[in-house]
Amino acid sequence: MAPKADKKPAAKKPAEEEPATEKAEKAPAGKKPKAEKRLPAGKSAGKEGGEGKKGKKKAKKSVETYKIYIFKVLKQVHPDIGISSKAMSIMNSFINDIFEKLAAESAKLARYNKKPTVTSREIQTSVRLVLPGELAKHAVSEGTKAVTKFTSS
């Protein structure tokens, strides 16, 4: 702390010659270089460049997960059971993997039939191809129910 005390009087002498606002700026500048690096992203974006702040918010929003929905289903099935963050991450990866497999299979089916659009029929067929046995039957029935509910509303 002694070296900091030595620096302050040196900073005060030029500050006494200059306006008091520079004195306030010089003292925190020596103390908070890390804080200044962190804060301008929030402060300068809010005051001057709103685009920088919005850009960062958009980057955070682009990360989409199924964590909320996994948790809701867990609470419907087992209200008294929780889930760790690692298990949640594994479940999220699992759902993303299944989604990618279904999307790829649906796209192949549309290409084979020379159709430009992936419809519910391609999705249903890809579910039957990707998922095994009883799981495929349940998935098809739930999917059909969801599509019916969507079209009726």
UniProtKB/Swiss-Prot annotation:
CDD domains: HFD_H2B (cd22910)
Subunit relationships: The nucleosome is a histone octamer containing two molecules each of H2A, H2B, H3 and H4 assembled in one H3-H4 heterotetramer and two H2A-H2B heterodimers. The octamer wraps approximately 147 bp of DNA.
GO CC field: nucleosome; nucleus
Keywords: Acetylation, Chromosome, DNA-binding, Isopeptide bond, Nucleosome core, Nucleus, Ubl conjugation
Role of this protein: Core component of nucleosome. Nucleosomes wrap and compact DNA into chromatin, limiting DNA accessibility to the cellular machineries which require DNA as a template. Histones thereby play a central role in transcription regulation, DNA repair, DNA replication and chromosomal stability. DNA accessibility is regulated via a complex set of post-translational modifications of histones, also called histone code, and nucleosome remodeling.
Similarity comment text for this entry: Belongs to the histone H2B family.
Cellular compartment(s): Nucleus; Chromosome
Stored PROSITE patterns: HISTONE_H2B
Residue stretches of biased makeup (Basic and acidic residues): 1-28
Chief subcellular location: nucleus
Protein name: Histone H2B.3
PANTHER family associated with the record: HISTONE H2B
Organism: Zea mays
Cross-link for Glycyl lysine isopeptide (Lys-Gly) (interchain with G-Cter in ubiquitin), residue positions: 149
